[in-house]
From Swiss-Prot:
Residues annotated as site: Transition state stabilizer: 66
Gene3D superfamilies the record matches: 3.30.70.100
One Pfam family cited in the UniProt record for this chain: ABM
Protein's UniProt name: Heme-degrading monooxygenase
MF annotations from Gene Ontology: heme binding; heme oxygenase (decyclizing) activity; iron ion binding
UniProt-listed NCBIfam families: PRK13314.1
This protein's encoding gene: isdG
Positions of heme binding: 76
Amino acid sequence: MIIVTNTAKITKGNGHKLIERFNKVGKVETMPGFLGLEVLLTQNTVDYDEVTISTRWNAKEDFQGWTKSAAFKDAHSHQGGMPEYILDNKIAYYDVKVVRMPMAAAQ
């Protein structure tokens, strides 16, 4: 399993604009190997908002299949370029080495 994060630096007070874009079912949910998505808002930033989109995939090839799909291109086609509220972004890839799940409570 891999996790891919896209961390965006957003003009202060506008993080909700990016978050709202992910608060609906999209086409990524239908992609082979897609395991889930979380949208994270960093707490206590002073000068800007920071939003991280974290996606989980069975394999890097599955993520690459998403980025090459027509659905990805459609979802990321910004008329006139990147939205003005996004100041910067960084993509990172993580190999998941350990996963721990909650244990059932003792009866």
